[in-house]
Design a protein with these regions (language model features):
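Short, C-terminally biased terminal segments at protein or domain edges
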Residues: 1-118
């Protein structure tokens, strides 16, 4: 397959994960094993599944891992909304992360389409 580090969507997803880890440092301590953990796991699952899919031997397998990444992106998006509604995230970091996750989702959808048609 291909080197995952060459994919713009992986690069953007990795950056998203780093930013999620940074903003969740300020979440309440009682959330460390719940919302903080859930958001971090959903975020890190996106680039991890892209990377794993790149190591598979068929396009169908690659597409399946990209779909898992897309599911994780949707999950992360929800946890961002929940974090904002619980007032754990202010408007500025929320808007930045929300924009970024939606860019990632669009890129994944496009890549899934290309992989399936090849």
């Amino acid at each position: 397959m291909q080197n995952y580090k060459d994919l713009k969507v992986w690069e953007k997803a990795h950056q998203f994960t780093l930013e999620v880890y940074e903003v969740t440092k300020t979440f309440p301590k009682e959330e460390v094993y719940s919302l903080t953990n859930q958001l971090r796991r959903a975020a890190s699952s996106i680039p991890a599944n892209i990377a794993e899919g790149c190591g598979k031997s068929t396009q169908a397998e690659f597409a399946r891992y990209l779909n898992v990444s897309l599911g994780s992106a949707n999950e992360a998006e929800y946890f961002l909304i929940l974090s904002k509604d619980l007032k754990y995230l202010n408007e500025m970091p929320f808007n930045k992360l929300f924009t970024l996750i939606n860019e990632i989702k669009a890129m994944l959808i496009s890549l899934i389409g290309k992989v399936r048609s090849s």
